[in-house]
């Protein structure tokens, strides 16, 4: 995998503020490539960055990450949908293209 691409993805993920999330697709729109490429970078190199702040477009994480991510969301005050436990993407989404 291109080292420059990996660095771009990880730098974008580091910019996501606590209590907010972005999507694989939103990161890909800025870094280039596609959501699956971003997912591959996160799987291989994402340990040192706040990986729980990058989620699927529907506000879910892969089940293997759910418990650890939920603890981070609660600690950071990330908006969750009541009852479902998934992220409230309308309130939690942060766009790396605009910084909002």
Residue ranges and their predicted role:
Residues 1-100:
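Nucleic acid-binding interface residues in structured DNA/RNA-binding domains
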């Amino acid at each position: 995998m291109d080292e420059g691409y990996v660095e771009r993805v990880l730098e974008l993920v580091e910019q996501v503020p606590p209590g907010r999330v972005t999507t694989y697709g939103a990161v890909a729109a800025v870094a280039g490539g596609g959501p699956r490429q971003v997912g591959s970078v996160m799987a291989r190199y994402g340990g040192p960055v706040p990986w729980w702040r990058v989620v699927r477009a529907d506000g879910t994480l892969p089940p293997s990450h759910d418990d650890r991510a939920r603890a981070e969301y609660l600690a950071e005050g990330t908006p969750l949908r009541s009852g479902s436990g998934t992220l409230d993407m309308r309130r939690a989404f942060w766009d790396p293209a605009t910084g909002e």
